[in-house]
């Protein structure tokens, strides 16, 4: 990525996904990158703050093994699992409980 700066960073990363064959995975990863870059621009973390966030994720990963998948628990704690369940089980306007 030449000329990497705040304005070109996101597009540069998205271009690196061009070889992803699974279109849905590419769409999801692209959206995650766009939103994550916006969070970084909005909050302007220091390197130490960002390292703390990465260390948190690293510690979570170290707790995982063949029986424990702590990223699922993290997804639950962050409300992501329930949001995905809610989205995937939407009721139509004409549908009753």
Label every PLM stretch briefly.
Residues 1-96:
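Feature of secretome-associated and extracellular-like proteins
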């Amino acid at each position: 990525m030449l000329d990497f700066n705040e304005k070109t960073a996101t597009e540069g990363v998205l271009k690196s996904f061009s070889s992803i064959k699974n279109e849905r995975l590419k769409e999801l990863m692209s959206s995650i990158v766009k939103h994550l870059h916006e969070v970084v621009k909005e909050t302007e973390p220091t390197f130490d703050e960002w390292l703390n966030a990465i260390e948190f994720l690293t510690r979570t990963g170290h707790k995982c093994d063949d029986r424990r998948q702590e990223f699922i628990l993290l997804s639950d704690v962050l409300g992501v699992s329930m949001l995905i369940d809610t989205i995937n089980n939407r009721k139509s306007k004409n549908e009753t409980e």
